[in-house]
Amino acid sequence: MNNPFKFGTIVGNEYFTDRTVELEEIRRTMLGPNHLVLISPRRFGKSSLVKKAVNGLDRPAVFINLQQITGIEELASMLLKGVFKLFPIERLKHWMTHFRFIPTISTNPLTDAVDLSFPIATDETAVLEDVMELINKLGAEKGRIIIVLDEFQEILEIDKGIDKKLRAMMQVQENVNYIFLGSQESMMTDIFERKKSPFYHFGKLIYLKKIPHEDFFEYVRDRLTPVMDDNATKAAETILSFTLCHPYYTQQLASQVWEIAAYESVNQDIVEKAIERIVTTHDYDY
C-alpha cells in the first residue's frame, strides 16, 4: 500500500485535490484567444493545477520557471529548448535558418537532452524576437501553443525594460496562449493591474484560494480510512484545524499521519505525534 499523500513536487492524477472550478476556468480561457494570470502564495499548488489543466487540453505547451533565468538570451534559449521537446529538431532547424543569429545545437546521445548556444556578442533582444516569432508560426501550423511562465514576477529582475520588450512581442502573437504564475501578490498585481505597466490587464486574473474545507476534508478522510478505519474522520478534522486547509501543509501532515497509522502500533494522538515529528525534523535544519 502506497502513501496517498504527496507534497513538495508537482502532483497529478490520484494525488491531485479538487480544484474543479479552477480547472474548468483555466481550460475555458485557454480554449479562447486570451491569456491567464494566476496568483497565490507559494505552495498553494499553482503549478500542479495548471499542469493538470493544460494536459487535459491536448495542446502543445512549454513550461518555464523564471527563477532559473538570468538574462534575455537565457530566456530565449529556455523557450527554444521547450519547443524542441514538442517538435522534430530537423523541422525546427529549417525554420531557424531565418534567425538573425543561428544557435549551435547539440544533443546528448544518452539523455536526448538538447543544448544550444548563440554566437558571442549576439543581440539578445533580436534572439528573443526570433524565438517568439518562431513559436507564433508553429502555433499557426500545429495549433495554438500554451506558454506557462512560472514565478513571473522575476521578469523584472532579468533585465531592465524587458517587460516592455516582452509585451511588444507577445501582443502580436495570435497563435499563443500565455499563463503567468506568481507567488508574490504585490509584485504580480503591480505588473498586471497598474495602469502604467506594459502588462496592464494583459490576461484574465485569478487569485487562487485555499481548497474549501469540506472538499479537503473528504479527500483526507477517504485516504486515511484504509489505515485508520473509523478514526479517519476525527484525524482529518484535526489535521485541517491545524493546517487551516493550506494545501502543502495539509498534504505534509496527512502524509505523516498515514505513515504512523500504517506502520506503527499507535492508536491515540496520532496527529499530535505526526506534528511533533515534522517539527523535530525541521528543527535539524537550523
What do these predicted regions represent?
Residues 1-36, 41, 89:
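A short, basic N-terminal segment
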Residues 19, 47, 246:
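Short, conserved phosphate/pyrophosphate- and ester-handling motifs at nucleotide-, phospho-/glycolipid
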Residues 32-44, 48-145:
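P-loop NTPase nucleotide-binding core
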Residues 33, 67-71, 154, 183-187, ...:
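Conserved nucleotide-binding/hydrolysis micro-motifs of P-loop NTPases
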Residues 58-61, 174-176, 201-204:
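Short glycine-/polar-rich loops that comprise or flank the Walker A/P-loop
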Residues 117-185, 193:
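Conserved Walker B catalytic segment
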Residues 190-241, 263-265:
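Helix-loop-helix "sensor" segment of P-loop NTPases
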Residues 222-285:
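Amphipathic alpha-helical "lid/sensor" segments that cap RecA-like P-loop NTPase cores
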